[in-house]
Amino acid sequence: VVLTDCGTGIVHSVMRPTLQRANGLVIVSGGSVDEARLASETLTWLEANGYGDLVRNAVVALNTATQATQLVKLDEIEQHFKTRVRQVVRIPYDPSLAAGSVIKWDQLKKQTRTAARLLAAHVVDGLAVAE
């Protein structure tokens, strides 16, 4: 398993060869409508550029990075992504993640660790089996 954080540079020249070799994608979306729109536009770009199979097999991590995220319509955002990708996992608000620094597993809340394990399980479930 190789992980790469491509940030927002989906059109960067290194992305095409990276996507051609990928078995799966995790698309991270914030919980706001604007953040969800950007993540959805990324999925649309991928589909329009020949990566529809990757989109259908993708997992969206719906990151509720701030306490205010609870005020938005997370259920509607989640339902939108469920029509486009294989799985959606909500990552709950956690002050350790919100700090934006090094993540220390043992300092995460139990529900955050559970969500991270679920995310990892969904990613592994979608990996192609070598024949």
Language-model features, listed with the residues they occupy:
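Conserved beta-strand segments of the P-loop GTPase G domain that flank and frequently precede/overlap
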Residues: 3-5, 27-31, 58-64
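Inter-motif core of Ras-like GTPase G domains
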Residues: 12-33
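NTP-binding/hydrolysis catalytic cores, primarily Walker-type P-loop NTPases
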Residues: 99-131
